[in-house]
Amino acid sequence: MSQEPLLVVDIPASESKFHIRDLTKVSDSGAPILNGINMDIPKGMIVGIIGPSGSGKSTVLRALNRLWEPPSGTVFLDGRDIRDLDVLNLRRKVGMLFQTPVLFEGTIADNIRYGPQLRGKKISDDEVYKLLSLADLDSSFFNKTSGEISVGQAQRVALARTLANEPEVLLLDEPTSALDPIATQNIEDVLVKLKQKQEMTIVMVSHSIKQIQRIADIVCLLVNGVIVEVLKPHMLSEAKHPMALRFLELSA
């Protein structure tokens, strides 16, 4: 049976981008991975999901654009069951950035054009330059290849490639865990700008509590497949759940 988290953040239904109800997953051995997840993700905010390894954070993220199909539970996007949406259109609206960037052969410009080209849409050079700028990359990257750039720069190229599909939502699964502090700050700055200037909804899984405190509007603490706390970042010290308190203490 799912447990009700300490809800310090009240999100009206009209302001919810994602409405998630009774999301459940069990392992092959029958052990619960997600235990009836209920949560609402507000429009135009950065939501951080934190918790111990194996608590189900990435599984929740993958359910939001159907990279994982839950056997039980429902996910609504703007009031519509995502199972009723064309999966390719869903993944255009709900872009995802992974921990390790994977770039295709060819130039950086070729990478950025890839998604729109699959839909028969041409991206002009000017549009590529704008997308590079959105990802905090200058025009010199246009004709470079993946072998000529750093991992941090490759992650920003992957972000620009995702933004080329004009998503309404960005899902990020530990996008800075392999990056140095400067590259991490670059990514964080880009995410905050996307929220502020484009009112983009961003859902980010991270093991770094400090990172979530820096950029998130709302924090969800996930423990053993259950959301046990939903708090504002500055209120993390007021968490009540024993497992959440232990995780926060060890992560400090």
Label the predicted regions.
Residues 145-149, 153:
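Conserved ABC ATPase signature
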Residues 170-173:
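Catalytic Walker B motif of ABC-type/P-loop ATPase nucleotide-binding domains
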Residues 234-252:
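C-terminal boundary and immediately downstream tail of ABC-type ATPase nucleotide-binding domains
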